[in-house]
Structures are given as structure tokens and as C-alpha cells.
């Protein structure tokens, strides 16, 4: 380790006790990061910053969906028991999928027959474009009009529909979908901004623009496990001198029920609503 005094560029690389800048941490990326961390409302961002933030959320949804699908494909590799495969699939997903099949022209009699469903299952798995269409239908029912690419290796997995139903309730996907669905709604802007900030920080970590000291994992387990991203954001704000966003601004709004449409965390839902 060098004993020479730190240069200006080296000191600028240090963003927090656990965070430093990576090679992709450009001035524009930095400016947007600290605007979001400082609680600046989204309507104060420049048009370029707004478009970039929206693009980041869209691409993080796409990345998250495909990574989670791959995870489920690996976990369910070789499994053919429907009881096991559907253990994480919410009932609401099957209703949406039923409607999607009807929209594709499948007769209800076929869907209500076990033999018919078996034939349909084989037909769908032989035609990945139909599976892609069903996935697009489900996304539209969730209110997402953005193009979301499902990678071919996920579509070709024999348990794709089970995998798809298992991942939709993942918190990252629901939060990103919430941001995309309610983008521009002033009533829930504080919540959208809060979620966008976390997603943006995660994006910067993934692309290497932020480098994280692994000791932050220990910090995140303290005080009732605040979470990795919360610990990183707090570290960044502390060094930058930001006081953080007040909780008074983020009041519970009925549209937040969207996060729980798959009943993926009833306990958290009730506790937040009472607060």
C-alpha cells in the first residue's frame, strides 16, 4: 500500500465507508445518484435523467425476470410433479393464465379437461412463441406496456409456466413494476422515487459503477436487518452529508396494494398499512 498522500482522483473514488466509485461512475451518473439520494422529486430531474431512470427500471425488471426464471429452472430441473412445481405459484397467476389461453383461442372445455390441458401443455412447449405470447399477456395484465424480453433459454425450459408463476411475486419485480405502472402519478411520487433510488443503486452495483465492501453485509444485519441496499444508501448519504428523506412524505396510499396483489407478504402488508 502506498504511503503517498491521496490524490484528488483517489479521494473522489471514496463515496462511503463501504462504497467506492467504479470505472463507469461518470459525472452524470454521480449527479443523478445524489439527486435521488437527496430526496429530489422526480419532476426536478432533467428530461435526460428522467428517461435514463425509467430505462434503468425497465431494464432491471427485464434482468430480474430472466435471472429469477433461470434460478427456478435450475431449482426445478428434472422435476415433473405438479404439486412441487406449483408450490410457489399464487392462485391469481393461474386465473390470469387461464384468461390468456382463452385470448389465444383455446376452448374453455379444453382447459377444464385434464386430458385437454396435457395436450395443450405439450403444444405450448413445442411452440415457444406461444409461451412468449402468454408471458406478454400476463405482463400486460399487470399493467406493464414496456417491452420485456424473455430470453430463449428460459422459454425453452419445460417448466416455463410454473417458473413464470413462481417469480412474479418476487419483491424486486413487484417494486419495479409498481414504478413503471405509476410513473408520473403525483399521488405516489414519493414512493416511486424511493423505489427508483434503490433500483438505481442496485443497477450501479451490477454494472460495476459502484464497488461495495463486503463488510456491509454484516452492517445490514444489524438493527433488525435493514437490508443491503438500505445500508448502502445510508452509507452514501452519511458521507455526502444528506439527511435522508423524511417518513412523513411517504404516506400509505391505496395504490401500494399493487405490491401485494399476489399476497406474497400478508404480514408486511398489514403492518405497513396500520402504520
Curated annotation (Swiss-Prot):
Organism superkingdom: Viruses
InterPro entries on file: Herpes_UL79
Family to which this protein belongs: Belongs to the herpesviridae UL79 family.
Name this polypeptide is given: Gene 18 protein
Organism: Alcelaphine herpesvirus 1 (strain C500)
Amino acid at each position: 500500500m502506498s504511503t503517498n498522500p491521496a490524490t484528488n482522483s483517489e479521494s473522489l473514488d471514496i463515496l462511503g465507508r463501504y462504497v467506492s466509485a467504479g470505472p463507469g461512475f461518470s459525472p452524470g451518473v454521480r449527479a443523478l445518484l445524489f439527486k435521488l439520494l437527496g430526496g429530489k422529486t422526480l419532476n426536478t430531474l432533467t428530461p435526460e435523467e428522467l428517461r435514463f431512470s425509467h430505462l434503468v427500471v425497465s431494464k432491471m425488471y427485464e434482468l430480474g425476470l430472466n435471472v429469477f426464471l433461470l434460478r427456478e429452472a435450475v431449482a426445478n430441473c428434472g422435476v415433473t410433479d405438479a404439486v412441487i412445481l406449483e408450490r410457489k405459484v399464487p392462485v391469481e397467476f393461474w386465473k390470469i393464465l387461464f384468461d390468456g389461453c382463452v385470448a389465444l383461442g383455446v376452448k374453455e372445455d379444453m382447459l377444464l379437461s385434464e386430458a385437454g390441458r396435457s395436450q395443450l401443455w405439450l403444444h405450448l412447449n413445442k411452440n415457444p412463441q406461444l409461451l412468449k405470447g402468454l408471458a406478454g399477456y400476463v405482463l400486460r395484465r399487470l399493467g406493464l406496456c414496456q417491452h420485456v424480453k424473455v430470453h430463449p433459454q428460459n422459454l425453452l425450459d419445460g417448466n416455463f409456466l410454473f417458473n413464470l408463476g413462481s417469480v412474479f411475486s418476487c419483491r424486486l419485480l413487484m417494486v419495479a413494476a409498481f414504478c413503471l405502472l405509476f410513473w408520473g402519478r403525483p399521488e405516489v411520487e414519493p414512493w416511486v422515487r424511493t423505489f427508483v433510488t434503490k433500483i438505481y443503486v442496485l443497477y450501479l452495483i451490477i454494472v460495476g459503477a459502484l464497488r461495495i465492501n463486503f463488510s456491509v453485509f454484516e452492517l445490514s444485519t444489524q438493527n433488525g436487518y435493514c437490508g443491503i441496499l438500505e445500508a448502502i444508501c445510508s452509507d452514501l448519504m452519511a458521507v455526502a452529508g444528506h439527511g435522508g428523506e423524511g417518513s412523513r412524505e411517504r404516506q400509505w396510499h391505496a395504490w401500494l396494494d399493487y405490491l401485494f396483489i399476489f399476497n406474497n407478504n400478508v404480514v408486511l402488508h398489514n403492518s405497513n398499512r396500520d402504520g
